[in-house]
Amino acid sequence: TLNIMAGGTKEAFELALPLLKIMGKNIFHAGDLGSGNGAKICNNMSLGITMIAASESLMLAKRLNIDIKKVHEIMKNASGNSWPISVYPPLPGLIDGTPSNNNYKPGFSVGMMNKDLKLANECAKSVKALTPLGAMALEIYNKFCEEGNENKDFSAISKVVGGDAWNYPID
């Protein structure tokens, strides 16, 4: 389901709303012109960071020889929950129908996430906002793109932090 974040005057938003409802389910008026793009960039920066965090957590559990399915269930119901954990996990075998169960065929590609993280980094610099985790996520996704993974789903980033611990080929 497409989430739409729109910026502009309240009047312009109300005028566009019937068309936006055709395209998406969750529609938000983010504020003035440009605010929709800014909201999307902030949301996707958080998503990129949390996908890496979910990957790191599950990788650590794997290295500690703890059953990944048990850790996943615990995290879904505890303070470690996030969208990547509850809806879109980076490891196969946790939730049916996710890209991790389909050889990381993209829903949202590594290349698109990398683009959004670059935009977030540029925006942060332009307003002198400190986003060290966003900058680190950009470095990680950028390197993954340079290694030829830009067309994989962004959840395949688990391969970077998981290394050989996953033992799941993505090609």
Language-model features: where?
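A short secondary-structure junction motif
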Residues: 23-27, 82-85
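ATP-dependent carboxylate/acyl-activation modules
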Residues: 21, 170-171
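General beta-strand structural signal in soluble alpha/beta enzymes
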Residues: 28-31, 133
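Short coil/turn segments
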Residues: 9, 32, 80
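Helical "substrate-binding/catalytic lid" subdomain
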Residues: 35-164, 168
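Short beta-strand and adjoining strand-loop segment in the mid-core
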Residues: 1-21, 27-29, 42-50, 58-64, ...
